[in-house]
């Protein structure tokens, strides 16, 4: 990865290194419930400390309107210390005298976690005065938070313009994984785009279509495409105002000689609830009272056959209402197939987005794909081809 400055370009020994991490992790009553992001960034910050850096962690947490104890990073800092098995000092401010004094007392190899950057309005406004206050605490800036790099905030983008700036190992791993699937992919490339609504995926579909060889449409958004083909979808979720848009996308795929895959059968029920009576029907035989809630066995088989001939897969969005059994079957079986192909060295597989990660967790394959991004909005914006301010600021000019 030559386009971005990484830690390979940085001499951190004895330096105060401001690391923008993403410590905005799920928690309940002050207890972290999913430490995945912390576990992922741990090797990156341990590397810095082992090279003699004074490691200062910056992050937001939640969406506070000013200082609010429930949005303090203190319990998260404790979880970071637990994960690293190293002491971490927590400071209940991120700028000013208290923070400056704590940084001044650090020794090489020490860790310090500062308080929630969003306690200050200057963070989200990318206020130069707030950036300057943060910059006083460091000699070097490391962005290790891809998941917030689509935000031009003080601690993601602003600092990169006032301090020597580098991509941390976690961010580097994301960028290298993405390069493999869209910038320099092994072909054929298949993309799975699922979820409920086309309206939230229009930019994504527009960016992917010219780049992939096969576009697989899943989830409720497939219903709008089916309606455009004149199929009856009963009481299924559908965006009637986007039927023409779905038709246009299919026309563009045909003109570009891209294969567009839609369900050929479906699992239907009259209610979306666990244990509801279900039927498998051909896509031409969806009844008036039916709701399409998952892809059927023939669709699963066809999607798996597409993946078997692909070399690269990018996946965003589930196939069905995976939160409710048995409507998780399509997503789980396709995920299992992707994991097996990846393990056999036949497929490079990158997936991301909130619902996608949750669905892959249900399938139990998160650690068996090439890379699963925990970055929600940033992953989607990257797939849409949009520049991410926090990443662009690290680009070698």
Predicted regions and their residues:
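Active-site loop-to-helix "anion-binding N-cap" substructures in soluble metabolic enzymes
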Residues: 1-397
């Amino acid at each position: 990865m030559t386009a971005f400055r990484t830690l390979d370009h940085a001499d951190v020994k004895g330096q105060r290194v401001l690391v923008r991490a993403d410590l905005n992790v799920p928690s309940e009553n002050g207890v972290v419930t999913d430490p995945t992001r912390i576990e992922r960034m741990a090797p990156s910050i341990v590397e810095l400390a082992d090279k003699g850096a004074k490691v200062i962690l910056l992050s937001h947490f939640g969406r506070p309107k000013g200082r609010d104890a429930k949005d303090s990073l203190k319990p998260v800092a404790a979880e970071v210390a637990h994960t690293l098995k190293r002491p971490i000092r927590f400071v209940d401010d991120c700028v000013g005298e208290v923070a400056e004094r704590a940084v001044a007392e650090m020794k090489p190899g020490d860790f310090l976690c500062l308080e929630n950057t969003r306690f200050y309005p200057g963070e989200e406004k990318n206020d130069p005065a707030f950036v300057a206050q943060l910059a006083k605490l460091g000699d070097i800036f490391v962005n290790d938070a891809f998941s917030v790099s689509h935000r031009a905030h003080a601690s993601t983008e602003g600092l990169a313009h006032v301090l020597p700036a580098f991509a941390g190992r976690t961010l580097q791993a994301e960028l290298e994984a993405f390069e493999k699937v869209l910038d320099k992919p092994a072909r054929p490339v298949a993309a799975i785009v699922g979820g409920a609504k086309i309206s939230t995926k229009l930019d994504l579909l527009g960016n992917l279509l010219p780049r992939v060889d096969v576009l697989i449409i899943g989830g409720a958004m497939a219903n709008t495409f089916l309606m455009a083909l004149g199929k009856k979808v009963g009481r299924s979720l559908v965006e009637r105002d986007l039927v023409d848009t779905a038709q246009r996308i299919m026309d563009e795929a045909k003109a570009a000689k891209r294969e567009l895959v839609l369900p050929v059968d479906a699992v239907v029920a009259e209610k979306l609830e666990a244990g509801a009576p279900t039927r498998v029907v051909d896509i031409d035989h969806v009844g008036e009272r039916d709701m399409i809630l998952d892809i059927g066995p023939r669709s699963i088989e066809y999607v798996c056959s597409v993946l078997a001939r692909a070399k690269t897969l990018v996946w965003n969005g589930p196939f069905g209402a995976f939160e409710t059994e048995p409507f998780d079957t399509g997503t789980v079986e396709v995920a299992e197939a992707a994991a097996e192909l990846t393990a056999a060295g036949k497929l490079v597989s990158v997936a991301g987005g909130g619902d996608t990660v949750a669905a892959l967790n249900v399938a139990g394959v998160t650690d068996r794909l090439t890379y699963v991004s925990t970055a929600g909005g940033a992953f989607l914006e990257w797939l849409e081809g949009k520049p991410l301010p926090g990443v662009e600021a690290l680009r070698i000019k």
